[in-house]
Amino acid sequence: FAQNGVMLYVPKGVIVEEPLHSVLWGPGANIAHVSHILVLVDEGASVTYVHESASPDDPQGGANSMHAGIVEIQVLQNASMKFVELQSWGRHVWNFSHERARVERSGNLDWIFGAIGSRLTKNFTELDLAGEGAVGRMSGFYFTDGNQHLDHDTQQNHLAPHTTSDLLFKGALKGKSRSVWQGMIY
């Protein structure tokens, strides 16, 4: 179940020229946000999709909120997707997400993460290169300060021959903030 979500289907052979954009805006304190993003890019299709999750900081201080999110992406044969995911939750939000993508034969996924918000973020991300010639890139940037903690766990699985993946995360930390990245390429 989810309170908020997006379902995006790009039909076979359709090339979406302009980026698509969605925003999950989560104002308020002491509440939980549950979201689910489901994307299917059919054979030979192409799309750029930008998703933002954001909220203001708690003006009174002392409150806590939570976000639990799921992202599922399927890029079929000869399809291409650029997925830009931006997170700027308020400093009172505890953010947890599990995200998974599967790229089929000669498909291409460019997955870009940007994180500047939340009290704590724990993100699990898996990329399955399931078809021969599949290509996947995961890149991210983050800027933290105060007592923020960002934790990214990435996994790239080469399940078929002649697949290619690339990974690059960079960030800057200020104050007592912390960041953890761990990952594996199989």
What are the functions of these language-model segments?
Residues 1-186:
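Conserved beta-strand/loop scaffold segments within soluble protein domains that form the structured core
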